[in-house]
Amino acid sequence: MSKQAIRLTQYSHGAGCGCKISPKVLETILHSEQAKFVDPNLLVGNETRDDAAVYDLGNGTSIISTTDFFMPIVDNPFDFGRIAATNAISDIFAMGGKPIMAIAILGWPINTLSPDIAREVTEGGRFACRQAGIALAGGHSIDAPEPIFGLAVTGVVPTERVKKNSTAQAGCKLFLTKPLGIGVLTTAEKKSLLKPEHQGLATEVMCRMNVAGAAFANIDGVKAMTDVTGFGLLGHLSEMCQGAGVQAMLCYQDIPKLPGVEEYIALGAVPGGTERNFASYGHLMGDMSREVRSLLCDPQTSGGLLLAVTPDAEDDVKATAAEFGIELTAIGELVEARGGRAMVEIR
C-alpha cells in the first residue's frame, strides 16, 4: 500500500486525546491506599489530576515530568507525530515551565504498517521538539496492534512560579488560548462531512505550541493554569473548580469555537469521548442544550491553556498573549462556591 493511500485513523479504535480512559474508570484504576506516598519535595502529584508531576530540587528550581501518547487523530503520519509531541510538551508549559528534553513512546503494528511510516511519525515528533528548543533524546518502542505515539517530557521551572490547576480564586476571570471543537472537526473529517474550507483547521490549531505558558507564569495574577485536552473544557474546568473550592460562570457566546463546529454537531459529528466526559462530569453542569453540552465536553487534542486571572492582571495577560499572537477574551469568571448551584453554569 502506498504512503498516499494510508489513512492512519483507520488503524485505531480511538483518536488523539479522545481515546483517554474515562475519568470515572480512571478513578477506579487509581484508587489505592498504596497511592499515598508522602514526599515533601513532591509539590504536585496525582491528587488534583494536574498536568504533570513537579519535584522541588531544593535550590529554587523544580523538575517537571510528564508523559502523553495516543492513537492517530489525523491520517498524515508527519502531522500525527507533530501533534502528539506538541500535545505532550504542552503539559510542561501548562505548569509554567520550560521543556528541556523529551524521549519518544512508539507502539507500531510492524506487520501491518511500514516502518517507513513510523519514521515519518517520529520525524513529526522531532520537528515539534525542535520547535520547542529541545532534543528528542531517545525513547522506547514496541510491536503493538494499533499505532501509538507520544513523548515523555522533562522540564524545569522556578519553584515560586509553578502554576497548578488547583490554586484559582473566586473573582478570577477565565481565559482560553485556543478555540474549542477539535474533536468535532476531526470526527466530521472521519465521517467525510468536513467542508473544503474547513480542511486543515483542526491540524493547524493542534500544532500550535502553548509556549506562552512560561510567560504567563511570570505574572503574579495568573493564579491557576491548565491545558484543555481529552476531558474537554468542562472536565478540566471542573478539576480547577474542585481543587480551589469555587464555581464557574461561563458565557457561551464568548467561548472561542472553530469555524463550522455548531453545524457539525447538528450533523452528528460528535466523538465518543464527548459522552464519556459527560457521564463523568455532567452532574456538575447547570441546565444547557445538547449543542452546548457537546461543545463543552468535546475532547480536545493539544488544546489551549485555561487561565484563572485576577482582574488587576487582565491587561498584563492580554499583552503577553498578544506578544505570542494570541487574541484573548474572557470566557467567564470564578465565584464563591454556594450550595444548590452547579459547579459550572452557562449564561
From Swiss-Prot:
User: Is Thylakoid there in the keyword field?
Assistant: no
**Does this UniProt record's set of keywords contain GTP-binding?**
no
- What are the binding positions for Mg(2+) in this chain? D51, D91, D227
Q: Which UniProt keywords apply?
A: ATP-binding, Kinase, Magnesium, Metal-binding, Nucleotide-binding, Selenium, Transferase
Q: In this UniProt entry, which residues are annotated as the site Important for catalytic activity?
A: K20
Q: What is its EC number?
A: 2.7.9.3
Q: Which reaction equation describes what this protein catalyses?
A: hydrogenselenide + ATP + H2O = selenophosphate + AMP + phosphate + 2 H(+)
Describe its assembly.
Homodimer.
Q: Which HAMAP family match?
A: SelD
Mind telling me what this protein is named?
Selenide, water dikinase
Q: Which gene encodes it?
A: selD
